[in-house]
């Protein structure tokens, strides 16, 4: 076997999947999807074809042309990270039909009961497939190397509607013939064609990596905010929908700016779905339908910077994709650079510089986090036997950004813009590795390897000496005020009069990891940071309070951990409680997780469990 990806059973000598046609019946009563997957390969194949699955039960594998069974086997011992290998024995076929069902514990899916939604009347389900969770929804070659087009026929309750990372084709009644293969998986046509059911059809015509497969089903409403953009939320969440429409009103301007910088927008639509608070990420760049946490809605338009990041992925990450997660920086480093270029034009250079400053602080914090695991401080790092969710960090984002910025600084912005457009045009709809990028870089910028130590940047540990810490008046002022706090001086009201969330975030992140409890409480008494509506500020302050042994804030910490599921907030707060705290803090961490666990997405559950098992 010649693996193409340390996180997949896919064999590089096998043909890759090019198209998947899915029929999906969503059963909200059991939290199970009954489905069939028609996989089309790049060429006919004879031999053992390896597929990735996780917690999937296969009823049968058929030749779609003859409907004759195709032999297959399922590994008896699941791999802790990769899941369960399914080996299908093909005899010259170029396609195969798999009838299967998912598990209630599918790692990509979070099923919400009616009581967990705004209306309290209807259930909700959504996906999160990055990095390696598409395999828990359908059998596939779950690697970014296998770019797929897909069609979906989705059967859902008629009181609900669906959105996907795909073009919506139509909503219609079900027909019995669609269920004939699913009957082998114990789902009859009577259920498929139930009076309370409806079918939604979708099509994704551009080839995408499997981790960008996405859907959400619930009672959804939307607002038009631009010619290419709708904002969706639960229809009962009127206040959230109104606030989101206001927060993201400038989206079309950002799309136009992205097109000026990086070339045509290839995905037609750029819609946004604000998910329930349990969504584990800030945003997910699913093409045509970006998923967002409600915590990015801050009321001052700064949440649009998350949208700028997901928009930038439309070129770097979605058009050009890392071939596997060892090269994740190719997705996120370029996208962080592209995001800041968009923000610089739309919101101003000062805001972009603040972004860089916050990122710089985050990068230095990650160096401390990984001081005993330096492999994780490399851009191109080895991940054999490593769960990508466990080592998710700011390194590929911020060190990757620094590397891209280093190239721009070397050749100048005008030349770099030309290079970037050529890079995107050359590799669009392809998945590449670091070496491919470096060879392209050296071919198009002759002598660059003599000016920049490319190997040190991509394979070296830590932060290279020629990285760039931002310089601006506001950045320097905030860093200076943070240093003064160490000496017992609090910022005056004049100092912070024009601060928004980003300024406070930068300030808090540059304070000592722990302070005198009286200092922390005095800061909060004056500026009410623990009550901030901006979770970046609130969580940064609460993290400081926990590490400073300010137990007066335990109630607010508990409340925060129970109302949001974004891992950016769960990780630092649970780590602070478990690692920096005493017996009381460790007990609080265990208690809160026990109470909140079922409200978190399965990916977030796994991350918190890993933190608690490490420190408690």
From Swiss-Prot:
Query: Which residues are recorded as binding substrate?
Result: 128-130, 282-286, 566-568
SUPFAM superfamilies per the UniProt record, alphabetical: ARM repeat (SSF48371), Leukotriene A4 hydrolase N-terminal domain (SSF63737), Metalloproteases ('zincins'), catalytic domain (SSF55486)
This entry's Enzyme Commission designation comes to: 3.4.11.-, 3.3.2.10
| Coiled coil regions in record | none
Query: Which UniProt keywords are listed?
Result: Cytoplasm, Hydrolase, Leukotriene biosynthesis, Metal-binding, Metalloprotease, Protease, Zinc
Q: Which SMART domains match?
A: Leuk-A4-hydro_C
Example GO BP: leukotriene biosynthetic process
What are the subcellular locations of this protein? Cytoplasm
Record family assignment: Belongs to the peptidase M1 family.
Q: What does this chain do?
A: Aminopeptidase that preferentially cleaves di- and tripeptides. Also has low epoxide hydrolase activity (in vitro). Can hydrolyze the epoxide leukotriene LTA(4) but it forms preferentially 5,6-dihydroxy-7,9,11,14-eicosatetraenoic acid rather than the cytokine leukotriene B(4) as the product compared to the homologous mammalian enzyme (in vitro).
Q: What is this protein called?
A: Leucine aminopeptidase
The organism named in the record is Arabidopsis thaliana
